């Protein structure tokens, strides 16, 4: 949620930010209109309350003086004022709900360093690491390799759950688990993150804090009986962990890592990446979240990206880092870097991590603040999030980049202590 004061004081700036995102800026005029009406209603209500209080004092005085007729007239006026005040209070509540809803629908303001563009074609490549492998044989896609070994099963997954699910057996199941443990070990032992075990079902309020609601409810799985949502990413419970709290500056930054399955309906992705494991309704991910201060959050974002890159470097998988343009930014993000791994089956780089600074966008929704060391004043924290990394896509990248002419796949050296085997199958 962006600051209503910013909209009041500099509406043209906010409108231009929305235009850069490809969003309709008309919502800002609607917000200003409702905000003005809401504030005028509050003023009128307070004036009537003041008049009613004055009447109460005068009634007591008049009765004491024996002027009962005048007192009765004021009592009647007080009753009329009470009815007006009640109606205004209802109007005030209704306007505040409308205002809050519209504010929740406004995306974050892009940072000045974000390239301006309409869509992903105008994202800017920042750097590359490694070179895509040149095969001296025709490489197979992961959706051919896994089933050929009998270790990746899409048909039984479909029988169990429908499309966009996968069953894995034996060495592939162990490789998935090895990747999770490897990533958690790197981030906790080398990068200083605190591992957190979080719920996979969260309240409506929680998932509103992190920005999925109210705008993207159709993308989420909802357990309607209890009004709990399956998390689309561990960012949700991690970023909302300190909602309603005041932290001390000396505690910051807080760096959290969590492994969870993630659940997404993918309602808007019909026809995209229909083969294999690239776009699933359920997938594993190791998530990184920082809670930090405004003055260092963009510096911290650079470190977060490097932490995610380390995983791919240790796995020796070629990748590139891309700065997303304004038109491709996520709803909550002020700045995002995507890390894209090379996949031979696509002959292209595909996203395996997305790292964002959402500034105080989530902190305002969740009332997450810290006390400044310098003057004791309270300020909203900044939150960062990033995949560290998507486990299923890492497995896919290993299968496709490490395959050998005989149809087997060599396990990356750093994973062998976790898997207990060097070759698949």
Curated annotation (Swiss-Prot):
Q: Determine if RNA-binding is one of this entry's keywords.
A: no
Positions bound to L-serine = 233-235, 287, 387
Q: Report the Pfam families cross-referenced here.
A: Seryl_tRNA_N, tRNA-synt_2b
Q: Which branch of life, at top level?
A: Bacteria
Q: Which cysteines are joined by disulfide bonds?
A: none
Instruction: Return the EC number.
Output: 6.1.1.11
What pathway or pathways are given for this protein in its record? Aminoacyl-tRNA biosynthesis; selenocysteinyl-tRNA(Sec) biosynthesis; L-seryl-tRNA(Sec) from L-serine and tRNA(Sec): step 1/1
Record function comment: Catalyzes the attachment of serine to tRNA(Ser). Is also able to aminoacylate tRNA(Sec) with serine, to form the misacylated tRNA L-seryl-tRNA(Sec), which will be further converted into selenocysteinyl-tRNA(Sec).
Quaternary form? Homodimer. The tRNA molecule binds across the dimer.
Q: What is this protein called?
A: Serine--tRNA ligase
User: Which gene is the coding source of this polypeptide chain?
Assistant: serS
């Amino acid at each position: 949620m962006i600051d209503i004061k910013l909209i009041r004081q500099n509406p043209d700036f906010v409108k231009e930010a929305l235009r850069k995102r490809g969003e309709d800026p008309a919502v800002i005029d609607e917000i200003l209109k409702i905000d003005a009406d809401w504030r005028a209603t509050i003023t009128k209500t307070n004036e009537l309350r003041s008049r009613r209080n004055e009447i109460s004092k005068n009634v007591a005085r008049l009765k004491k003086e024996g002027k009962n007729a005048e007192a009765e007239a004021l009592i009647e006026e007080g009753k009329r004022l009470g009815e007006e005040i009640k109606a205004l209070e209802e109007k005030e509540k209704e306007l505040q709900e409308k205002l809050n809803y519209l504010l929740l629908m406004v995306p974050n303001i892009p940072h000045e360093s974000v390239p301006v563009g309409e869509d992903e074609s105008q994202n800017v490549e920042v750097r590359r690491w490694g070179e895509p492998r040149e095969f001296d044989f025709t490489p197979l896609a992961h959706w051919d390799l896994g089933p050929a070994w009998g270790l990746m099963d899409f048909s039984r997954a479909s029988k169990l759950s429908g499309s966009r699910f996968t069953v894995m057996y034996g060495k592939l199941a162990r490789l998935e688990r090895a990747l999770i443990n490897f990533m958690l070990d790197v981030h906790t032992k080398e990068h200083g993150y605190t591992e957190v075990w979080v719920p996979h079902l969260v309240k409506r309020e929680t998932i509103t804090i992190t920005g999925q609601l109210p705008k993207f409810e159709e993308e989420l799985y909802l357990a309607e009986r209890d009004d709990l949502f399956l998390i689309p990413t561990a960012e949700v419970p991690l970023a909302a962990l300190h909602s309603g709290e005041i932290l001390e500056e000396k505690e910051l930054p807080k760096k959290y890592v969590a492994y969870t399955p993630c659940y997404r309906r993918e309602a808007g992705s019909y026809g995209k990446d229909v083969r294999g494991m690239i776009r699933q309704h359920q997938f594993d991910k190791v998530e990184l979240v920082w809670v930090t201060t405004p003055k260092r959050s963009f510096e911290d974002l650079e470190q977060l990206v490097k932490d995610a890159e380390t995983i791919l470097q240790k796995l020796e998988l070629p990748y590139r880092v891309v700065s997303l343009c304004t038109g491709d930014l996520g709803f909550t993000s002020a700045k995002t870097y995507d890390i894209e791994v090379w996949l031979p089956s696509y002959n292209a780089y595909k996203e395996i991590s997305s790292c964002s600074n959402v500034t105080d966008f989530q902190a305002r929704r969740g009332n997450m603040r810290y006390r400044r060391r310098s003057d004791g004043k309270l300020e909203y924290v900044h939150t960062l999030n990033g995949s560290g990394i998507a486990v299923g896509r890492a497995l896919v990248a290993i299968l496709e980049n490490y395959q050998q002419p005989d149809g087997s796949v060599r396990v990356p050296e750093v994973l062998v202590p976790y898997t207990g085997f060097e070759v698949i199958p």
